Curated annotation (Swiss-Prot):
It catalyses: C30 botryococcene + 2 S-adenosyl-L-methionine = 3,20-dimethyl-1,2,21,22-tetradehydro-2,3,20,21-tetrahydrobotryococcene + 2 S-adenosyl-L-homocysteine + 2 H(+). Its EC number is 2.1.1.263. This is Botryococcene C-methyltransferase. CDD domains: AdoMet_MTases. It is a single-pass membrane protein. GO terms for biological process: methylation; steroid biosynthetic process. GO terms for cellular component: endoplasmic reticulum; membrane. PANTHER family: 24-METHYLENESTEROL C-METHYLTRANSFERASE 2 (PTHR44742:SF2), PTHR44742. Pfam families: Methyltransf_11, Sterol_MT_C. The gene is TMT-3. The keyword Cell wall biogenesis/degradation does not apply. Keywords: Endoplasmic reticulum, Lipid biosynthesis, Lipid metabolism, Membrane, Methyltransferase, Microsome, S-adenosyl-L-methionine, Transferase, Transmembrane, Transmembrane helix.
Amino acid sequence: MALDLLSSYAPGLVESLLTWKGAAGLAAAVALGYIIISNLPGRQVAKPSLLQVRTGGVAFEKVAEVVADYSDSYGQTEKGELIVKDNNKIVSLANTFYDLITDGYEWGWGSGFHFSHRLPGMSFNASQLLHESRMASFLRLKPGMQVLDVGCGVGNPGRTVAACSGAVVTGITINAYQIKRAELHTKRAGLVGYFKPVQGNFCAMPFQDKSFDAAFAMDSTCHAPKLEDVYSEVFRVLKPGAYFATYEWVSTKNYDSNNPEHVKCMNSIILGNGLPNIRSWKQAEEAGKNVGFNLLTSLDMATNSPIGKPWYSVPERMVNWGLFRFHKACIRTASTLHLLPPESWKFFYILAEMAENLVKGGQWDIFTPMHLLIFQKPE
């Protein structure tokens, strides 16, 4: 995580460190020093410190209980595939997940909670912004159009789309803490009036029928109990002829549910991201068509660039250098010393294992977080 922090400000330096044998030692010094000196008051900042992870959506003293409930929410099918025990708790599970992880994501990854290609000569942050800005092109946006960001998180994709198109973007997220973060970032970006976050369930949206000119979702609808649940709501609030573009987390044609290693990999991705399950790319296509959309484009963007570094290149480097193991040790130590909430290390262990399995899923080409679907509501 120390290298993630540095990467936000000096990605070139981090890439150099990752080719140097002393990277782990330097990371240790930076991380442990940062833990000690970062005990700041719980105020809103553009980028949370490590210790402010504890002051996100869960009170310090409640973390152990919340983490235990989170893990207990899952069971397994006869094939060993992970599923949520009670479908009625899927929405609250996603809310709990983002209570626990929002600060961590912002600290270690950035305010765009998604993956992207890394094109030659482009930094990580620039690649993320390029990935977000493509949505404006996919949707054929024009200034003043009313656009819906489905599952907006803390709002970086929505702000990017608004900034590069002049459209007015409304984002919806289930999580109250993410609304606070989104409002802060939007004010700092000077985009008040162009991006507005709204708290709500994207499977039961508080918007009028036919009220949006376009809609998009970026790595978010994977949290829906069923894709039809969220797709039908998007269909309802779109005007006739409007476009809906979404990046879906799906299994590819190479996934084999009878392969124990494939199942283990997917289970870790599900648990480590608060998902109900992982659908196939074909199921995602059919879900859109089932609610009335016309399917215009279906493309795995993870495989479309012959020169870009893969979406999993950042966690892959960290796995190759053993940095996730180092991170786990730092978090366990900080938790033991009560610099982080007791038992919080258990959740970070889940995340570290998930990151390693994201890399495997990408390397084995059984999973993609970048399957692009573009739908159109009939006129």
